[in-house]
Amino acid sequence: MATPRSAKKAVRKSGSKSAKCGLIFPVGRVGGMMRRGQYARRIGASGAVYLAAVLEYLTAELLELSVKAAAQSGKKRCRLNPRTVMLAARHDDDIGTLLKNVTLSHSGVVPNISKAMAKKKGGKKGKATPSA
């Protein structure tokens, strides 16, 4: 007895795990890295999805802050370079604590003038210290 054509099984579209979850970061690659790194004996399927989503969120947040910092530089063109990414990360409290031990190459240092090096206002000019 043949089955009618309308009773065929529903064909499921194939696609990546990232596309199924609505993410840009590669869920399969993150899961493979978790398994190869041997962080645990068993890793569930949702663990890779969750980690990829967290990484994607943090990256989007850092890029958003970097674009704002580059736009505030006052130049006509907005260009992202390691320096603007580092400055944006260091000036944000949450991301700054996450990345406080991270060194970004070709980014320089955060400009900071210590109070001891700053010029003191209201100093007396007339008195000179005797040198012996």
Swiss-Prot record:
Gene3D superfamilies: Histone, subunit A. Transmembrane segments: none annotated. Belongs to the histone H2A family. CDD domains: HFD_H2A (cd00074). InterPro entries: Histone-fold (IPR009072), Histone_H2A (IPR002119), Histone_H2A/H2B/H3 (IPR007125), Histone_H2A_C (IPR032454), Histone_H2A_CS (IPR032458). Coiled coil: none annotated. GO terms for molecular function: DNA binding; protein heterodimerization activity; structural constituent of chromatin. The nucleosome is a histone octamer containing two molecules each of H2A, H2B, H3 and H4 assembled in one H3-H4 heterotetramer and two H2A-H2B heterodimers. The octamer wraps approximately 147 bp of DNA. Keywords: Chromosome, DNA-binding, Nucleosome core, Nucleus. It comes from Leishmania infantum. Core component of nucleosome. Nucleosomes wrap and compact DNA into chromatin, limiting DNA accessibility to the cellular machineries which require DNA as a template. Histones thereby play a central role in transcription regulation, DNA repair, DNA replication and chromosomal stability. DNA accessibility is regulated via a complex set of post-translational modifications of histones, also called histone code, and nucleosome remodeling. The keyword Nucleus applies. It is found in: Nucleus; Chromosome. Its main location: nucleus. The keyword DNA-binding applies. GO terms for cellular component: nucleosome; nucleus. This is Histone H2A.1. It holds the Pfam family Histone. SUPFAM superfamilies: Histone-fold (SSF47113).
